[in-house]
Design a protein with these regions (language model features):
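Conserved N-terminal phosphate-binding loop of PLP-dependent enzymes in the Aspartate aminotransferase
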Residues: 1-155
């Protein structure tokens, strides 16, 4: 709902909307509290273009940091877009090691992918930029340290 309550919604262009009322079937539909908080979230965050501009700026920051991280991990690939991105490091063990090191330094971050090989960044859209910068700094350092440790172990 934008305020932490589960909310299912489907946005359809009017020209494609042929459904009748109640044909949209979502797990969290009909949650009155979520509808109320969703309305408040829309009124607060989407009243003008600032929220979208803030999201775009944070997404660009995420792009830059993931690009720097990709340079540290040979063969890695960036995935996703906007504020839903990740770095496919090619190995679930490597992704887990990066996430574990980040956790030890104060950042909770998860993996995804068919072999848990993607270090996934899925920060809330409302994350303050300074908080995002701190988290990405921890993640970048965790990646650098993990790769340094792996390189020394391989030698």
């Amino acid at each position: 709902s934008g305020m932490g309550l589960p909310f299912a919604a489907l946005l359809i262009r009017p020209e494609y909307d042929i459904w009748k009322p109640a044909e949209h079937n979502g797990t969290f539909r009909g949650n009155t509290h979520a509808f109320v908080t969703a309305r408040v979230a829309i009124e607060k965050y989407w009243a003008d273009a600032r929220f979208a501009e803030d999201i775009a700026a944070k997404a660009r920051l995420l792009d830059v940091v993931l690009g720097e991280m990709a340079e540290l991990v040979p063969g890695s690939r960036r995935k996703g877009r906007g504020m839903m991105q990740g770095l496919d490091v090619g190995s679930g063990d490597l992704a887990a090691a990066i996430c574990a090191r980040a956790f030890r330094n104060g950042l909770i971050i998860e993996t995804s992918g068919n072999a848990d090989q993607v270090v996934k960044v899925l920060a809330p859209l409302t994350t303050p930029e300074e908080t995002l910068r701190r988290g990405l700094s921890i993640l970048h350092e965790a990646t650098r340290e993990t790769m340094k440790t792996n390189k020394m172990a391989a030698e």
